[in-house]
C-alpha cells in the first residue's frame, strides 16, 4: 500500500483501454481491397451461410469483414469501405463493409432501413 506522499509523487497508472477495431487505426472507416469473398457458418445455435470478405486495408491490416444485406456484387479486387462493428455469431469478424460506397452497390428493392444498406429512395 503506497503512502500519500508516494501517490502525490507518482500517481496511479491508468489501465489502457483495448481498441475493439485496431485495424481502423483511429479512423471511422478505412478503404480496402477484397482479397477473398466467401461464406462462413455461424456459431452454435444459429445456422446460415453468412457472406464475408477478407479485406486488405490501407492501414496495412488484413481483416475479415461482414457483407450486410441480401445479395452483393463483391468479388476479388473490389474496392470497399470498411467500418467497425462485430458480428456476434461469427468469431473473428469485427468489421462491416459499408454498402452503397465505392464498389459495393446498395441492396436492391430495399424499402425500409435503407440508409444502412445504401439503397436509394424508391420513386
Curated annotation (Swiss-Prot):
The modification 3-methylthioaspartic acid is found at residue 89. The gene is rpsL. With S4 and S5 plays an important role in translational accuracy. Interacts with and stabilizes bases of the 16S rRNA that are involved in tRNA selection in the A site and with the mRNA backbone. Located at the interface of the 30S and 50S subunits, it traverses the body of the 30S subunit contacting proteins on the other side and probably holding the rRNA structure together. The combined cluster of proteins S8, S12 and S17 appears to hold together the shoulder and platform of the 30S subunit. InterPro entries: NA-bd_OB-fold, Ribosomal_uS12, Ribosomal_uS12_bac. GO terms for cellular component: small ribosomal subunit. It comes from Syntrophus aciditrophicus (strain SB). It comes from the Bacteria. The lineage of its organism: Bacteria, Pseudomonadati, Thermodesulfobacteriota, Syntrophia, Syntrophales. Keywords: Methylation, Ribonucleoprotein, Ribosomal protein, RNA-binding, rRNA-binding, tRNA-binding. This is Small ribosomal subunit protein uS12. Belongs to the universal ribosomal protein uS12 family. Part of the 30S ribosomal subunit. Contacts proteins S8 and S17. May interact with IF1 in the 30S initiation complex. GO terms for biological process: translation. PROSITE patterns: RIBOSOMAL_S12. GO terms for molecular function: rRNA binding; structural constituent of ribosome; tRNA binding.
